[in-house]
Regions:
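Hinge/lid segment of periplasmic solute-binding proteins
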Residues: 32-69, 136-196, 380-386, 557-580
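Extracytoplasmic "Venus flytrap"
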Residues: 52, 72-91, 193
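Short, polar/charged alpha-helical segment
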Residues: 60-66, 83-103, 198, 202, ...
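Long, aromatic- and glycine/proline-rich binding clefts that accommodate carbohydrate-like moieties
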Residues: 60-62, 74, 379-388, 437-501, ...
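Extracytoplasmic "Venus flytrap"/periplasmic binding protein-like
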Residues: 94-171, 206-208, 212-214, 345, ...
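Periplasmic solute-binding protein
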Residues: 136-156, 172-219, 231, 254-303, ...
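Extracytoplasmic/periplasmic substrate-recognition and gating elements
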Residues: 179, 327-332, 341, 351, ...
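Glycine-centered hinge/linker elements that transmit conformational signals in sensory
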Residues: 229-235, 272-336, 386
Length: 580
């Protein structure tokens, strides 16, 4: 994730907002040849595409015609600073103006600031932005509070005339992530990236290293299927190999500084990877990866004593393993790093594997001249599905996938909401989406993933295309609907995790405290009664043994949390997907 100096642009946007200028010079629009502009864009910008050039031209003509009531308007939208959104802000806003006459100020700010602006508009009713690209992690929040427009309703009613006939919602791989407990779609996916396992393919195929590993551990060096194998491989490179080509090497990389990013290191599905929740895709039911249990659609508790799993043996195991691996196998400085500081480290060439690696780093990991890139431009590394802990079983989610999605608020005036809806659809339309995917590597459409262009690019992307085409993809999902207020609950995680990392508290004490704090938030939401029929309603406390004796989560402590390691050769794994 890169930050650009946008002060001048943002200053002009703010001046416009403060002065209330919502119109461009209408006479300038009269001189625009929308059809000619569309033709140029199809030829010069929006290639490749899964649509024919004729189909692209027809789709853009629909935008031109449908935008007529809003021609000359200026709308304001916002997203976090990702390469994908930079392309939208710098290129697609201009393209949209050229075919519609609608000017779009697409602001780029930090993710936390996006949520802050969103909350400000919700709480005050003042229109801060006309549309937001907001993480679908907030789906449980949006579907309960009533501030966000249910797009399913909007597309059938006041947004019907402005909904793209070729939008093809079924083509969006993340549409289930933006669907509430009521079955309604609340957000339109704009970009997605997963959190996967990353490893040095070249080292794992080194004959001497393979021989040495098998002699020590009794099974082949390969892609770890379970956490036991991950730990063995981490130990092998850090404690046994120690050095390659004169450089120290490590079998693990992570970060551990007391910082908000330590929170999403866990809420981005670490507990589900260990197996703390229940079966269910996109999220465990009745208990999800935050350890929150729901009955029907009502959250009823986080603590084991209320039927939750936030302080369950599986959750404590997940936290303890994170701490042990960070301290025993990662570079010493990793404990003092934040997410953004640790992100570039694997590209420096001294890390053998990383269990928690975001695919947004792909573009920065394939640059020429890096120690992890071959001379022909292909990567020395690969990404694959993450290994799972001993509490995990088939049918559970296995990892996290971030989905930034277009979100409309009811407090936005209807006309501005309709115009913003046009822009949101434009930047995810089939005319645009494949080119945008190639720029930002954050795919949202199945048709794009299976395109010839992605096939051609696949060898340079280290397994990204193979993962998104695989049946395994469905087990990587965002935070789900069990979380009724993402901002309030997410902020609890990092401080509690940090207490365990520092040694100030045990893993069990830290998770007990977190579970108790989550329950207090749920209790306050229940007391206020603002979330309707799907708002929290806490269970009474029971003996934890009662819940351990029930089927599913919370699960009792296993007698053996470290079964024998299992691995699979990377090429064999890829072949098995292709045969399905």
């Amino acid at each position: 994730m890169r930050e650009h100096n946008l002060k001048n642009i943002i200053h002009l946007m703010l001046v416009c907002v403060l002065l209330g200028c919502s119109q461009t010079d209408s006479t300038s629009n009269q001189n625009i040849d929308f059809a000619a502009n569309a033709e140029k864009l199809v030829l010069n910008e929006f290639q490749p595409s899964t649509l024919s050039k004729e189909e692209q031209t027809k789709e853009l003509a629909w935008f031109t015609k449908t935008a007529e009531p809003f021609r000359g308007m200026t709308i304001n939208v916002v997203s976090e600073t990702l390469t994908t959104h930079e392309y939208e802000s710098e290129v697609l806003t201009e393209a949209f103006f050229e075919i519609t006459g609608i000017k779009v100020n697409h602001d780029l700010i930090q993710e936390g600031d996006v949520i802050e602006k969103l909350q400000t508009q919700m709480q005050t009713g003042q229109n801060v932005y006309d549309a937001y690209v907001n993480d679908s992690d907030l789906i449980g929040t949006h579907s309960r509070y009533g501030y966000v427009v249910a797009l399913s309703d909007f597309m059938e009613n006041e947004g019907s005339a402005f909904t793209l006939p070729t939008l093809d919602l079924e083509d969006f791989i993340g549409i289930s992530f933006t669907t509430g407990p009521d079955g309604k779609i609340y957000q339109l996916p704009d970009q997605q990236f997963a959190n996967l396992y990353w490893f040095r393919y070249d080292w794992f195929n080194d004959s001497q290293l393979k021989k040495q590993f098998e002699e020590i551990y009794g099974y082949p060096l390969g892609v770890p299927i379970n956490w036991s194998a991950y730990q063995d491989i981490a130990e092998f490179f850090t404690k046994e190999v120690k050095e390659i080509d004169g450089q120290p090497v490590y079998g693990h990389m992570d970060y551990g500084k007391k910082d908000p990013s330590l929170g999403w290191r866990f809420t981005d599905a670490w507990l589900s990877m260990a197996g703390a929740g229940d079966k269910g895709i996109p999220n465990g039911l009745p208990v999800d990866e935050w350890g929150i249990r729901v009955e029907g659609c009502r959250p009823v508790g986080s603590s084991v004593s209320r039927g939750g799993a936030t302080n369950s043996p599986a959750a404590v195991y997940a936290l303890q393993k994170y701490i042990d691996w960070l301290k025993n196998y990662a570079p010493a400085e990793a404990s003092g790093m934040t997410f953004s500081e640790a992100g570039p480290v694997p590209a420096q060439g001294q890390i053998a594997q990383q269990i928690f690696w975001y695919t947004t780093f792909t573009a920065d990991m394939i640059k020429e001249g890096l120690p992890v890139v071959n001379e022909d431009g292909t990567p020395k590394w690969r990404m694959v599905p993450s290994p799972h802990g001993p509490y995990w079983s088939e049918g559970m989610k296995l990892g996290y996938q971030d989905t930034g999605a277009w979100t409309l608020l009811k407090s936005t005036p209807l006309e501005r909401r309709q115009a913003a809806w046009l822009y949101a659809q434009f930047v995810v339309s089939k005319t645009v989406s494949l080119k945008k995917t190639l720029v930002g590597l954050t795919p949202i459409r199945d048709s794009d993933i299976r395109s010839e262009a992605m096939t051609n690019l696949a060898p340079r992307l280290g397994g990204l295309v193979e993962f998104y085409r695989s049946p395994a993809r469905t087990a990587w999902t965002p935070t789900g609907t069990n979380v009724p207020d993402y901002p309030k609950l997410a902020q609890l995680w990092w401080a509690n995790v940090a207490n365990a990392v520092s040694g100030e508290q045990t893993a069990q004490t830290a998770m007990n405290q977190l579970a108790e704090q989550q329950d207090r938030v749920l209790e306050r939401l229940a007391t206020h009664g603002v979330q309707g029929d799907c708002g929290p309603q806490l269970n009474e406390r029971s003996d934890p043994e009662y819940w351990f004796n029930q089927e599913g989560a919370p699960k009792p402590k296993l007698a053996d949390e470290n079964p024998k390691g299992k691995t699979v050769p990377y090429d064999e794994l890829i072949q098995s997907w292709q045969n399905q």
